[in-house]
Design a protein with these regions (language model features):
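FAD-binding core/adjacent interface of flavoenzyme oxidoreductases
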Residues: 3-12, 79-171, 178-184, 254
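Rossmann-like dinucleotide-binding core of oxidoreductases
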Residues: 150-217, 225-227, 316-353
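FAD-site-proximal beta/loop scaffold in flavoenzymes
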Residues: 126-151, 249-252, 256-322
């Protein structure tokens, strides 16, 4: 009896980056493609980190172990190969990714690399201001706050010119204000908020109904001084110098610098990218020039639908849209493997706005049918009782991610 072996040509997709967008894209593609798809995720960190909860780490409300887990076991369970390596560059003509652990060939490439933080945006930002956006930065802030309380002074919190992640800085501001009251030193501290935004509550999304009025009310209620439409000229050991010439004394400074594209993109001469290192994509998240290259999450170039008045700033790229773009990419690679040409499209600005801004055991719920205007509905709802929703979203997303339930919202 003759036995005929049927050879099934597997499609290999390499995903660079293992945070919200990368994890979702990899697991969703494997779930849809099953044995016909080989999916490899390359990341330099063994841990998945729920970044939105970093704002609680300086205040000991969370430890890093509470908001992170090893990703390899989850990926393996879902059939995704994990490679702990740093991606160095890609040759899109040869379809080869070079890492510090060797080269990887691909049929499709998904770039979900997250950001590089531009600390050199102004003199002194790297040396004298803190940054809440990394585990190391959050732990340094914890140490700085514990020293600060021994000899309180003015605090400056905010965002630099070109920044897009204003929301996390707002959250840190209100958490610091609550912490100062808990430490019984609030009356000894002048608290300043500085932002390039045209107005309070712009958030890089052109604002929300009643948002400016609400935040102005918070600033009055908590006695926080604020400056809008300002850039950072320089940060020193004990001051922040604004573009207006004003000098704010500061014993502790926390600023959100801009995000730019990672070195992997900049090192890849055959990969067309924008001047700031992001990937130009169609509404399907396929590269505008290279048919088998895709991008998801922060790596995506998002064009601003508004003009900044005086100081340039950007738009936020948060976990929910990153997760959504990862799903779109997975669906489209799967469709192409099926011979389909009808790609799913979901422009970044049309992704629903779903955000909870923590305000020091209080919260503001932000909902809209799309991130950018025009919107059918948009709502900012304060919850002054407790930050139930923020905690629930953290617990839900960690549960979902630890189990690899990538198809869930």
């Amino acid at each position: 009896m003759q036995v005929h072996l049927i050879h099934i040509e597997m499609i290999k997709t390499v995903v660079i980056g293992g945070s919200f967008a990368g994890m979702t894209a990899a697991m969703e593609l494997k779930r849809k493609g099953k044995e016909k798809h080989e999916v490899v995720l390359i990341d330099k960190s063994p841990l998945f980190l729920f970044i939105p909860s970093l704002i609680w780490v300086p205040f000991r409300r969370r430890e890093l172990k509470d908001i992170s887990f090893k990703k390899e076991a989850v990926l393996k369970k879902r059939g995704v190969d994990f490679v702990l390596a740093e991606a160095i560059s890609v040759d899109t003509k040869l379809n080869v990714v070079t890492t510090d652990k060797g080269d990887f060939h691909y049929d499709h490439l998904v770039i979900a690399t997250g950001p590089k933080v531009q600390f050199d945006i102004a003199p002194g930002v790297a040396e004298y201001s803190h940054y809440i956006g990394t585990p190391n930065g959050a732990m340094k802030l914890r140490s700085a706050l514990e020293e600060f309380v021994k000899n309180p002074g003015p605090i400056v919190i905010g965002a630099t010119q070109n920044a897009g992640c204003m929301g996390a800085a707002y959250e840190f501001l209100f958490n610091v204000e609550k912490w100062l009251r808990d430490q019984k030193v609030r009356k000894k501290v002048d608290l300043y908020w500085v932002t390039p935004e045209d107005y309070l509550g712009h958030f890089g999304i052109d604002g929300m109904p009643m948002g400016e009025a609400m935040l102005k009310g918070f600033m009055r209620m908590f006695n926080i001084h604020y400056r809008t439409q300002v850039a950072i000229k320089e940060v020193t050991a004990d001051s922040v110098i604004l573009s207006t010439g004003e000098v704010l004394k500061s014993s502790l400074t926390q600023l959100m610098p801009p995000f730019i594209g990672v070195d992997f993109v900049r090192n890849s001469s055959s990969l067309p990218s924008t001047p700031n290192g992001y990937i130009p994509v169609e509404d399907s998240y396929r590269h505008k020039e290279i048919a088998n290259v895709w991008a998801a999450g922060i790596a995506v170039q998002v064009d601003l639908p508004f003009e900044c008045k005086n100081i340039p700033y950007s738009t936020p790229k948060t976990g929910y849209p990153s997760d959504e773009t990862g799903k779109v990419v997975a669906e489209n690679i799967f469709r192409i493997s099926q011979g389909r040409t009808d790609l799913k499209e979901k422009p970044w600005g049309k992704i629903p706005g779903l955000c909870v801004m923590d305000a020091g055991k209080k919260e503001v719920l932000i909902f809209s049918n799309s991130l950018f205007r025009p919107r059918v509905f948009a709502l900012m709802l304060p919850n002054v009782i407790y930050d139930f929703t923020k905690v629930f979203i953290e617990k839900y997303f960690l549960w979902k991610s630890k189990h690899g339930y990538s198809w869930l919202p």
